[in-house]
Amino acid sequence: MGRLRLRPAALWLVVLCAPLAARAEVALSSFLQQNTAVNTVTANPGGRHYKWLEERAQLKLDATGGAWRLLAKGDFAYDHLGRGEQSELREGYVDYAADNWDLRAGRQIITWGHGDLVFVNDVFPKDHEALFAGRPLEYLKRGIDAVKLGAYPELASFELVAAPRFRESRVPDSRRFHVFDPMPAVTNRETLKPGQGDVGLRMYRDIAGYDAALYLYRGFQRTPSMRPDSMTAPTKVTLFHPKLSVYGASVSGRAGDGVLSLEGAYYDSRQDREGTDFAVPNSQTRLLAGYQFQPGEDLSLSFQYYTEYMHDYGAYRAGLPAGFPVDKRWSHTVTVRVTQLFLHQTLRFSAFILRNTSTSDYFVNPELRYSFTDKVWGAIGVNLFGGKPWGQFGQLSPDDNVYLQVRYEF
């Protein structure tokens, strides 16, 4: 998030819709928030002992008039760890609703699929740094500047998302997190972003009481890959986003005393379908099964099993440079989430546990949140990481932290 992220298109959107806001029912709301995260193991690579230290304010405008709606959320923050003053348009879009179709244009947050911190068909950008630094979970998702068209014939419902400009996921900052780098001595880095946008389609309907959906996506990997200019004596590393298509499906519904969800997708690595380019992720099949139920009053439990299968594994092994960590053909992950409410539902304890049985990676996040009033709440939690030094969570094992969130809403 830069110093100012209110792009001209966003300003044009506000100006264009000002007459709507003037004639519509308008709701204004806001919050003030303090967010602190402190290391418990060692200092950051940049030498500081805080993962996060900021004050933040959000202003929200929601205007509705007839078939039209305007929503805008703007964040303003001050970061004490070197980023200083920041502002960002979190969401800003216009809705139009007709009888059997609707349209949304502008910056919007889109979520597909059923995974809990495990993503199969949810191909839209994330903020992984926000999750690992103990920010509120709503900041895990990043908005995209897109047009979303919904159509609702009798056969099924359709949702088409077209973004003219690609937006990447935010990865942890190497000055705040101990991120694995196979070429740390090469400091000359160049980042290449796709010069075109991406498009996705979701088709969904009810089948015998179950919510079923098909997904299509054509775009790019949200997290970058790295390619050195030479394998023998590299002087420059280029970060780029490989081309990607995703074909997926999901189904969810009642099963026994809970809700069962099944999800799968094929990740087509269009830039390297043979699997011989070590810098481009191989094509994958991803499968997810989840079950959520309530064994007692104010208590909920959920379990997930997630697996990834790497295609063209022999070609991947043959093309992998010497000294690089080796991924396995199969990856297996299990997760558990428990949530318990106390004190007339004003106190909430939650814990999320993720364990990759193939790489020994783990991520543990217990949190205690208390609502002091209807407008003020606070939360304290812990992020624990572990596993192999090159694993998704193992690389972050020095980054264990305790975080505190306090928010006043008005």
Residue spans of the language-model regions?
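Transmembrane beta-strand segments of Gram-negative outer membrane beta-barrel proteins
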Residues: 24-41, 63, 68-72, 349
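Repeated loop/turn-to-beta-strand initiation elements of outer-membrane beta-barrel proteins
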Residues: 26, 67-71, 101-103, 155-158, ...
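Residues on the lipid-exposed face of transmembrane beta-strands in outer-membrane beta-barrel proteins
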Residues: 57-63, 91-96, 147-151, 201-205, ...
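Outer membrane beta-barrel
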Residues: 62-178, 205-208, 385-387
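Detector for outer-membrane/organellar transmembrane beta-barrel domains
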Residues: 252-274, 278-354
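Outer-membrane beta-barrel "beta-signal"
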Residues: 396-410
